[in-house]
C-alpha cells in the first residue's frame, strides 16, 4: 500500500473518529475487508483485551468501546474515543511484528489535567500531546525488542514514532509522519 493511500485513509478515519463511539460503524475506505484485530495489556491496571475491532467493512462498536476503556487515562479513569487511525496503526503494527502477544500499554489517552501535571513535573511529555486527542499510544512488546517495534512502526509510514529506550517504550500516533 502506498503512503499516499494510507494518508488518505487515515484522514478519512480521523474524521470518522470525531464522531462518538456510536458513530464508528461507517465503512472504512480500505482495499481489504479482512478483519483487523489487536491485543492490549494495560501495564497500570492489569487489564487485557484481545479483540477483532473491524470486520465486514465496519468498526465493531463494542470492540472499539472496550479498546477505549483499556486505553483510558489510568490516573483518572477518564475515557475518550480513540482515533480510528491509531487503532489501525496498532493493528498494522501487530501484523508487521507477526506476533499474537498483546502490546504492553504504558499510556493511551491522557486527560488534559493528567498531561499538564506530567508536563509541569518534567516527565518529558509534550504540552499539546496527541495522547490528549486520543491519537497516540506508548507501548512495548514482551517478545520483540524496542528496536524491532520502532523499526516496524517506522516502516508503516502512518504517523509519528518516538523511541524511548530509557523509559522502555515506543510512542506511536496517527499524526503527521515523523520520528524521533
Annotate the PLM regions.
Residues 70, 89-96, 100, 121-124, ...:
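Structured segments of extracytoplasmic/periplasmic soluble domains
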Amino acid at each position: 500500500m502506498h503512503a499516499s493511500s494510507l494518508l488518505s485513509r487515515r484522514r478519512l478515519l480521523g474524521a470518522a473518529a470525531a464522531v462518538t463511539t456510536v458513530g464508528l460503524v461507517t465503512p472504512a475506505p480500505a482495499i481489504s475487508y479482512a478483519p483487523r484485530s489487536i491485543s492490549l495489556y494495560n501495564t497500570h491496571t492489569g487489564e487485557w483485551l484481545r479483540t477483532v475491532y473491524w470486520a465486514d467493512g465496519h468498526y465493531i462498536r463494542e470492540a472499539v468501546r472496550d479498546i477505549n476503556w483499556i486505553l483510558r487515562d489510568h490516573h483518572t479513569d477518564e475515557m475518550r474515543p480513540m482515533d480510528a487511525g491509531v487503532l489501525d496503526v496498532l493493528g498494522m503494527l501487530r501484523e508487521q511484528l507477526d506476533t499474537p502477544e498483546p502490546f504492553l500499554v504504558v499510556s493511551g489517552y491522557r486527560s488534559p489535567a493528567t498531561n499538564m501535571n506530567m508536563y509541569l513535573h518534567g516527565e518529558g511529555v509534550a504540552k499539546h500531546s496527541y495522547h490528549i486527542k486520543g491519537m497516540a499510544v506508548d507501548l512495548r512488546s514482551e517478545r520483540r525488542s524496542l528496536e524491532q517495534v520502532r523499526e516496524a512502526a517506522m516502516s508503516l509510514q502512518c504517523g509519528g514514532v518516538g523511541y524511548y529506550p530509557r523509559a522502555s517504550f515506543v510512542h506511536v500516533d496517527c499524526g503527521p509522519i515523523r520520528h524521533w
